Amino acid sequence: MGGLSLLQLPRDKFRKSSFFVWVIILFQKAFSMPLGVVTNSTLEVTEIDQLVCKDHLASTDQLKSVGLNLEGSGVSTDIPSATKRWGFRSGVPPKVVSYEAGEWAENCYNLEIKKPDGSECLPPPPDGVRGFPRCRYVHKAQGTGPCPGDYAFHKDGAFFLYDRLASTVIYRGVNFAEGVIAFLILAKPKETFLQSPPIREAVNYTENTSSYYATSYLEYEIENFGAQHSTTLFKIDNNTFVRLDRPHTPQFLFQLNDTIHLHQQLSNTTGRLIWTLDANINADIGEWAFWENKKNLSEQLRGEELSFEALSLNETEDDDAASSRITKGRISDRATRKYSDLVPKNSPGMVPLHIPEGETTLPSQNSTEGRRVGVNTQETITETAATIIGTNGNHMQISTIGIRPSSSQIPSSSPTTAPSPEAQTPTTHTSGPSVMATEEPTTPPGSSPGPTTEAPTLTTPENITTAVKTVLPQESTSNGLITSTVTGILGSLGLRKRSRRQTNTKATGKCNPNLHYWTAQEQHNAAGIAWIPYFGPGAEGIYTEGLMHNQNALVCGLRQLANETTQALQLFLRATTELRTYTILNRKAIDFLLRRWGGTCRILGPDCCIEPHDWTKNITDKINQIIHDFIDNPLPNQDNDDNWWTGWRQWIPAGIGITGIIIAIIALLCVCKLLC
């Protein structure tokens, strides 16, 4: 009783203390502890770089699960490299996690592997598991392998992303992408009486009529899948293959496929024809495409740069078994052909162009055998391409090729249109400047120019180009599909329309700032990346590491954007300064010449009263501000020697809460004392 008597308070003081306790409790409810997450759509780039904490997690409804692709971190996406990241294990049950949104995938995979005895290596997909919905290229591989295990897992512990479902195992015959699962904290929406609640889509639902995209399929055959030494063959048609022995890009395979069809280097028997790539051939064209070829637009695989050479002919003992016969060959690289030999030496002053009456249909990228191109769009997109197919006297003949992607997939067994006799001449794919140069008058040295004649007008559609290319739906629509950096992430998770952005063509393999998101229609905006749940077959840290790679890619993209903006502003400042200087000099010169008539203003009147103001200091200050706030600021310290009291401000709400709890306990003891 002696101890309790010390806690007794007068009735008026008790009321004041109780009121103070309730105020503290309500204050703690209203101001929760921050979780260290980037905040709303109005954040600045410096806030992202410094990871400023401004938002609070009030409820679990603010969390949104997002699938992040590993290719955004710069991993190799070709089939030989990707298969080395997958392995079979037994005794580990698969895990499936649902997520709500995800990135656009540049490369997806589809596997159908059998054991030597003919049984399936991979399990069938469970009910509700559908293919990844946004794939630019689908690498469809068939083959055999030992498959030493029940399931195929990711060796690094990553997920295999399907349609709104992420699994730790590969399922048979379903498109998937490699990735991890992260969570975004969304800004809490403000609810009003006049605003209806948002309509949420089902978790496993991806239909979005506003998104148009093209998916291309590349087919492979793999021998000894899952083993240390395996063989991968790229399928041109049912009997023609290319052995892949180095990292490559899908763009290289597409160019190679068209070149083999163009040179008619297909198997002309029922046996197999396997081509091997020479070591000098560059297989990295179009790296980091992400819906656009941004590495080097002039770096293409042209037909005249390759030569085909037969190596050996291996036949079985039974000559009648033609189907088992294998012919081998090599695709070599040779010097680039000069286009000057296309112009005749004894040509007149003008080389006219005309379109021949008979069109020659060449195997285009959408009509070749061995792959299918499916376009999921409600529109029909047509493009006419022009290609020089040979010379005829003093005229260059151009054959128009119509490319019309349709919503249905072109079967791989479709026959190739037989070329006309004109197509037997050496075929050359030329770039725009090379072809247009032939329209100018050309006179051989040492010869007198002949009489000038008018060239016939070349009437072609406006969209005629000089190279056959795949027409993507997003190239013909005003609303693009590419979103990048933080603005793209925040906008793509909301209801705003996305716009396409041209990115740097010199992006290295370690930095890929192009993150493209597909998502259900939500009214929320993404606030930032918070944390990743720990799932997987047991590789520690893979998910956190994967998220940090993607976050670093965002920071890398922002820094790269700031560098480019600063350089552009500096060039613009230099140009405007020089232009202002030249303008003032010219004005003085004109005034000097017109001084006998009273000068320029006496002649022009009030129209000459224009002063080229000097804004150099303003632009320089803005450039220095960008450099100071964004480029020169170092990244947060990644060392592990952080002081335990570094974030002491974050302990203030916790201290207030603990103090409130202690006071509440004391108040309850006082109440009990009074009642007793």
From Swiss-Prot:
> At which residues is there a site annotated Involved in receptor recognition and/or post-binding events?
L57, L63, F88, K95, I170
List the InterPro entries. Ebola-like_HR1-HR2, GPC_FiloV, GPC_filovir-type_extra_dom
Disulfide bond residue pairs: C53-C609, C108-C135, C121-C147, C511-C556, C601-C608
Going by the entry's taxonomy, the superkingdom of the source organism is recorded as Viruses
The cellular component terms of Gene Ontology attached to this UniProt record, alphabetical and capped at eight, are: extracellular region; host cell plasma membrane; membrane; viral envelope; virion membrane
This protein's record includes keyword Cell membrane: no
Q: Which residues form a coiled coil?
A: 554-595, 615-634
- Region labeled Receptor binding — which residues? 33-185
Which stretches does the entry tag as region Fusion peptide? 524-539
What's the domain remark here? Answer: The mucin-like region seems to be involved in the cytotoxic function. This region is also involved in binding to human CLEC10A.
Protein name as annotated? Envelope glycoprotein
Query: Which species is this record about?
Result: Sudan ebolavirus (strain Human/Uganda/Gulu/2000) (SEBOV)
The gene that this protein is the product of is: GP
